[in-house]
Structures are given as C-alpha cells and as structure tokens.
Amino acid sequence: LNRIASILSKHSHQFIIVHGAGSFGHPIAKKFNLANGLNKNPNQKKAIEETREQVLELNQILCNSLSKKKMLTKTIIPSKTMKTNGPKNIESIPTEIFDKGLETGKIPVTFGDVTDDNLQGICILSGDVIMEELVKHYKPRMSIFVMDYPGVFDRNPTDKDSQIIPVVTLQTLKMLKE
C-alpha cells in the first residue's frame, strides 16, 4: 500500500479510489453466507457488523498510507451511503459525496462492503460493481485496477496456459465473456 501511495502522490490528476475487501472481509462473508442475503442464522447479524468493521479497517490502513504522502482522503462507506437491489445493482450511488471530495482537493475512497438490500435484506456490494457505476457517471479517460496478479489474464491465472492480456479493450472484454 505504501508503494501505491508513493506512486499516486506523484500525480496531479484528480482520481477516485475503489478497493476490495480482500482477506479482511471475504472469510467472514463466506463463512456466514452473506452473499445470499439474510438468513435465520442468529450469528449472521454479528458477522455483518464484523465484516463491515474489517473492511473499514482496511480502508483506514489505505487512507493512512495516502496521508503519509500528504494526500487528503474522503472515505465513502457503502453500508452507510448506498443501497442495492441485488448484488450487481446499486439503487443510487451518492455522486454528490464523491464530487464534494474532489472539489475540496480530497481523494474519494470507497470499497466493497455489506450493504442493505431491497431484495434479500443484505448484499455483498463489490468494489468492481461500484467502479462500474462510477465509470458510467464520471467517464474517466482510464481506470486502473491493482490486484494480486501481474495483469488481466485470458483465463484463470492459475491455469498454466493462461496469458496476460497487455491492453484490455472492449473487443478483448467481449472475447473474455465468450
């Protein structure tokens, strides 16, 4: 994270950061089946809160790394600002909060989270889905994804025949969907 913060600190462009939950949120979410909504498990509500706390902790670590490089951040917490209609459908994204951060010279930072959901009670809202909505609204010149692998692959990166796709275009994405 410190290396990423160092790289970002050298650029004067405005940008928004969306990060995933990684190992902070995924284990509990999986153990308590949060992706499938509310259920009768009495421990699930505690698991929801614990997952939310852990992804917020990861967010704080990232924001602290940016702060050390003199970058101001504005955290937008999805579980407090967004609601979903199923796992890939954000009811409304609070662009005015992102805009206010950008207007005041801050970097808006948001992340994958457990949100309240109109269809199943709760939902895992991934950072990728948030990113899609932000791209539709802001229409950035480019989006950069940082991940555990050295790029986007044509198939599962653990497959020995997988190949890195050097530049991802709409045509590449169509090919990957097939």
Segments predicted by a language model, with ranges:
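N-terminal glycine-/serine-/threonine-rich phosphate-binding loop
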Residues: 1-16
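Polyanion-binding loop/helix "lid" in catalytic or ligand-binding cores
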Residues: 3-7, 46-63, 121-124, 129-132, ...
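Short beta-strand segments at enzyme active-site cores
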Residues: 14-26, 73-77, 109-110, 144-148
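Glycine-rich loop at the start of a catalytic domain that most often binds anionic cofactors/ligands
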Residues: 22-38
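Short, active-site-adjacent cap segments at secondary-structure transitions
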Residues: 22-27, 81-84, 115-117, 150-154
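Short, glycine/charged-enriched secondary-structure capping and boundary segments
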Residues: 30-33, 90, 123-124, 157-161
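Ligand-binding beta-strand-loop-alpha-helix segment within the catalytic cores
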Residues: 33-115
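Internal active-site segments that recognize and position negatively charged phosphoryl groups
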Residues: 62, 89-154
